[in-house]
Amino acid sequence: MAEAVERTDELVREYLLFRGFTHTLRQLDAEIKADKEKGFRVDKIVDQLQQLMQVYDLAALRDYWSYLERRLFSRLEDIYRPTIHKLKTSLFRFYLVYTIQTNRNDKAQEFFAKQATELQNQAEWKDWFVLPFLPSPDTNPTFATYFSRQWADTFIVSLHNFLSVLFQCMPVPVILNFDAECQRTNQVQEENEVLRQKLFALQAEIHRLKKEEQQPEEEEALVQHKLPPYVSNMDRLGDSELAMVCSQRNASLSQSPRVGFLSSLLPQSKKSPSRLSPAQGPPQPQSSAKKESFGGQGTKGKDPTSGAKDGKSLLSGLATGESGWSQHRQRRLQDHGKERKELFSTTTSQCAEKKPEASGPEAEPCPELHTEPVEPLTRASSAGPEGGGVRPEQPFIVLGQEEYGEHHSSIMHCRVDCSGRRVASLDVDGVIKVWSFNPIMQTKASSISKSPLLSLEWATKRDRLLLLGSGVGTVRLYDTEAKKNLCEININDNMPRILSLACSPNGASFVCSAAAPSLTSQVDFSAPDIGSKGMNQVPGRLLLWDTKTMKQQLQFSLDPEPIAINCTAFNHNGNLLVTGAADGVIRLFDMQQHECAMSWRAHYGEVYSVEFSYDENTVYSIGEDGKFIQWNIHKSGLKVSEYSLPSDATGPFVLSGYSGYKQVQVPRGRLFAFDSEGNYMLTCSATGGVIYKLGGDEKVLESCLSLGGHRAPVVTVDWSTAMDCGTCLTASMDGKIKLTTLLAHKA
């Protein structure tokens, strides 16, 4: 509690200084300096009592204890009255013992003279009035205990503990509860981190156990079947290579005088005709029939007459229990075929790179395997470069995905507020929904605008307020808790489209982008733009407005000519503003000087979305040309990286239906968002959000996670990291909003 009081005092000082209340600040400092409660510091209160005893100031000691009784002890229940009385008695005895030990009998006599009226009727003091007159009170059995060092230390510790418990149990004002909240938050974060590590450890253990279960089965299959090299590598051998392997094996067989039973049974369909020697001649019908009955069931389309063994070798092999061996062999070959097909369907590279543990006699070639690629559920890239099906560690775990379905038309904007607790969504019909998702998904406010709405932004300081930009030249301030419009201001009648709104992080102002009617929709502002290059090349203005007075402060200069600004974004402290325009130019404004610091042509066509990077040394932009580009803001026009994105990530977005129905929507909301550390980016796609890894050296963005869940193209995204778990929002053209909760893996 003492630490919380001290920090609160500092915050109050800072606030008074910020507001210019210097007289109040001086008065506060004076009262804090004379504070008898010492900021609820127990050690300072005990030190104050000891200092008063050391200077023999009995009156001040009595007054200070009376103040503590009146200010602190009076709040306790009656059952603690005996404890307080015992502490007071021990304090006065401690004072008397100190006067005797320092040979100040006059102070001891003064104590009894001033306290006699109060103490003479108390039984515990009747023996103490003779204390000043005893020659050696420390040897007296009645007082010897109080002169020991142990008793003095015990009293100080008891007083300290009593005050500590008292301060912990005291009701505190709301402003001091933040310390306990911080401690609880830190504790929850630590518990979350422990659970996170346990979760990833369990995942790794499950993966290891699965791998251990698969490995013995694969090894057993290889040991049992003893496949020769040309069978295990059949999937990557051509005809010429296969003929060479067969010829090599023919040479090895001619050198070996011993022929096994299994080799005599295996069909010879893959042998070259050159293997038949003139002395062998054609096979006997009986041997052909035997080969059909025992070996022909495993593989279809075999030629029983090609390359058969002589009758003597075959009959010597069939002499031992041919029926039992044939069934056992057929069962093993079928199991082997199933296992190879399963391995090939799981990962082709794993089976292709395996080497057989032993090369046995000739075996029946497996039938041709048709492998189907495993559709990735979350990862876009599956097996690693070495094969083996071992996936790289996923950066996120999807804890859950929920759907908000109260919109019935295409979403334009979907934004989480600063606290990460509420979401504001806007569709093309002018329906605004404010809803929460923690602990349950619930609509808090709903409103329908008579005029078309084009832009939406949360206020930063009062996060209950929404800024709504319309298509008729007005900006509305909407209170989400009172569920009403606080005010509506007219921006410009000649430039009715409010394309973008951005509120400064300090909450004092916001910027507003107003533009003339688009060339494709001069009358109906709700009609979607077709996204052709040059269709939005209309005049525009960028204005700065005061949030409190709702009055225009200034108009920014847009060089070389006024143009429609599509997107705006502030940096963390509001000193910089970046904008993307319909002419493909990115402009960086200094908000302290209120002027354009630099500008450069970034895209062919319009700039759809622009954001600052995590370290704010660069900005990212997505344009009509389908490029995702990173720019250095310290050098105008310096390109750090450039990537090409799919058309369903950049727009215009197209939703097709039956009978030639086709809906086209140009990007309005945010097209990409970053995680808390700026290492990953969430973008739109035709079936859901896609998360890419940033900062790599590759020329192509690495797709890490596909969120999915949508049946219509996703048109805007947002990523909130205010909570411990990240929350990804993806909104689509069918009015559905998916809320995906992610747990980030921390190394």
Curated annotation (Swiss-Prot):
Phosphoserine modification sites? S256, S288, S293
User: InterPro entries attached here?
Assistant: ARMC9_CTLH-like_dom, WD40/YVTN_repeat-like_dom_sf, WD40_repeat_dom_sf, WD40_rpt, WDR91
Give GO BP annotations, semicolon-separated: early endosome to late endosome transport; negative regulation of phosphatidylinositol 3-kinase/protein kinase B signal transduction; regulation of protein catabolic process
Key words, A-Z = Coiled coil, Endosome, Membrane, Phosphoprotein, Repeat, WD repeat
Q: Which organism is it from?
A: Homo sapiens
Q: What is this protein called?
A: WD repeat-containing protein 91
Quaternary structure per UniProt? Answer: Interacts with WDR81; involved in early to late endosome cargo transport. Interacts with BECN1; negatively regulates the PI3 kinase/PI3K activity associated with endosomal membranes.
Segments carrying the region annotation (Disordered) are 265-393
Basic and acidic residues: bias regions: 332-343
| Major location category of this protein | membrane
Q: Where in the cell is it found?
A: Early endosome membrane; Late endosome membrane
- Family membership: Belongs to the WD repeat WDR91 family.
